[in-house]
Design a protein with these regions (language model features):
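N-terminal helix-turn-helix
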Residues: 1-70
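Short amphipathic alpha-helical coupling segments at ligand-binding clamshell hinges
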Residues: 60, 64-67, 105, 109, ...
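Central regulatory/effector-binding core of bacterial HTH transcription factors
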Residues: 90-155
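Hydrophobic hinge/microswitch elements
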Residues: 129-134, 139-142, 149, 205-267
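Acidic, Gly/Pro-rich loop/turn segments at junctions of secondary structure
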Residues: 129-195
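Short beta-strand->loop
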Residues: 162-170, 260-275
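Secondary-structure junction motif
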Residues: 182-220
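A late-sequence structural motif
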Residues: 266-305
Length: 305
């Protein structure tokens, strides 16, 4: 059954005349008649009484008319709803981001980008999750951009031919812990075989966990750690460090306010234990929506943040 048949049927029902209905539908009368007959065959009953000059609906036609009207109305409304949805989706830029950057970096970065732009983004969607989940989101095409930390010793699933990236800024993972009564680190590095340092560790799905683990493998001497708590959320590790439960490698941007005198945290060692990292924005190499492409071009020519 073709929806054109329904439109033809309703035109004949309205005009009560095949010739005038055909003129209104901009088709020949024989073509209109064939399509109405095809609809009647599909329904299984005559819809019009053709015995008189003025065409009238049969009882079956009277029953079928509101069905045809409702069907076409629903189809047209559904089409308009989908078109509106597609239009909105095309104008929306979706970001995936690790939890730490979603909280500490994304809002100010986006504001700085938009302040320097002639047209701010009209639709923004942010999905905050673990690095592992964010990579999956990108690989499945559910986001256009991924904001994450990066280190060459810990390449991720997006490092390669299908994605490209921009470096937006830099940060440092610093080992921090609560101070003791004298202000010295309560859990100092590097520890030793008989006295490992209580370690507040990132879980396996965390991007910063991958980075920290890879970077520690190159440190001399290698820290002697005993994991006492695990989470993929840097803010939670910070809370546990403030509570004195161990040492955590945390972004300097996250803990800098806590490293001032009396702030609750101190460095657990000198600068040799620091891990420099970059902040990257990944995107697929395949072409994105026009709005997303314009945003990317703006970033390529703009400053870092």
């Amino acid at each position: 059954m073709d929806t054109i048949w329904l439109e033809d049927f309703l035109a004949v029902a309205e005009w009560a005349n095949f010739s005038r209905a055909a003129e209104h539908r901009n088709v020949t009368q024989p073509a209109l008649s064939r399509r109405v007959k095809a609809l009647e065959d599909w329904v299984g009953a005559p819809l019009f009484d053709r015995a008189t000059h003025r065409i009238t609906l049969t009882e079956a036609g009277e029953r079928f008319r509101p069905v045809a009207e409702d069907t076409l109305r629903r189809l047209h409304q559904g089409r308009e709803d989908i078109r509106a949805l597609v239009s909105t989706a095309a104008a929306t830029v979706t970001f995936a981001s690790t939890h730490a950057l979603a909280l500490t970096y994304f809002p100010a970065w986006l504001r700085a980008v938009e302040d320097a732009a002639p047209e701010p983004l009209s639709g923004i969607r942010l999905v905050a999750d673990t690095m592992q989940a964010c990579e999956r989101i990108m690989l499945q095409g559910q986001a256009q951009f991924l904001l994450c930390h990066h280190h060459p010793a810990a390449p991720g699933r997006l490092d390669g031919g299908d994605f490209r990236s921009l470096t937006l800024g830099a940060d440092t993972l610093v080992p921090v812990c609560a101070p003791d009564g004298a202000g010295a680190p309560r859990h100092p590095l590097p520890g030793g075989p008989g006295q490992p340092v209580a370690h507040l560790s990132y879980s396996d799905e965390s991007g910063m966990g991958r980075i920290a683990e890879a970077a520690r493998g190159t440190m001399e001497p290698r820290p002697c750690l005993e994991t006492v708590f695990t989470s993929h959320v840097a803010v939670l590790l910070k809370t546990m460090a403030l509570d004195g439960r161990g040492l955590a490698w945390l972004p300097l941007s996250l803990v800098q306010p806590d490293l001032v005198p009396g702030g609750g945290l101190v460095r657990a060692g000198d600068g040799r234990w620091d891990i420099p990292i970059t902040i990257r924005l990944f995107r697929p190499r395949a072409r994105l929506s026009p709005v997303a492409e314009r945003f990317w071009e703006r970033l390529k020519t703009g400053p870092t943040y």
